[in-house]
């Protein structure tokens, strides 16, 4: 019958060296309970690429955009902050796994897939500076064609980038209030 899925011949491939690096960086920086998603293939590719940059270089990825504000991905974002000089993220949105007004705001997906999409360009300089996170949300209610037209005419210089000041938890967007940590825990077993 042949191969029915791309994973048929690749199920559970092990990458011991790469997974060790992910454990030392993304996982070590994460406070999430379940860290399995940090071993996702696109995060593996980014970890591999950062390590291959050496002292300096540039990398670009088009990926799922869930890492931008996902709780589990805070360790990944903290690693980007620690290891890179500039990170440019163009959030193309398009997450159709939402409902109501949020689904209307996300609207068109540039690849006609269910998850949102982002373009990330990262720069690593030989002499490290504090990282600068450049973020742009492409906008609300845009069709896939409108988003692609914006991408087509965009350059690093003409995009109105928002400079993100990450907090100590690795939050870039929707940052939590730091006073929250001083509040007493609720429920049994909650100890700070």
Feature annotation, model-predicted:
Residues 9, 17, 29-32, 48-192:
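Sequence-level detector for compositionally biased, low-complexity segments
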């Amino acid at each position: 019958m042949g191969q029915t899925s791309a994973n048929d011949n690749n199920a559970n491939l092990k990458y011991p060296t790469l997974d060790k690096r992910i454990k030392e960086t993304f996982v070590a920086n994460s406070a999430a309970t379940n860290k399995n998603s940090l071993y996702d293939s696109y995060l593996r590719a980014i970890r591999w690429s950062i390590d291959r940059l050496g002292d300096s270089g540039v990398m670009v990825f088009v990926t799922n955009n869930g890492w931008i504000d996902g709780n589990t991905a805070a360790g990944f974002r903290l690693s980007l902050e620690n290891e890179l000089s500039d990170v440019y993220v163009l959030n193309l949105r398009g997450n159709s796994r939402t409902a109501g007004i949020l689904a209307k705001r996300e609207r068109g997906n540039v690849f006609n897939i269910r998850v949102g999409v982002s373009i990330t360009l990262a720069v690593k300089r030989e002499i490290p500076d504090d990282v600068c996170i450049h973020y742009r949300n492409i906008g609300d209610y845009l069709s896939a064609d409108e988003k692609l037209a914006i991408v087509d005419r965009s350059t690093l210089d003409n995009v109105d980038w928002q400079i993100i000041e990450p907090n100590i938890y690795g939050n870039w967007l929707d940052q939590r209030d730091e006073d929250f940590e001083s509040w007493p825990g609720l429920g049994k077993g909650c100890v700070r």
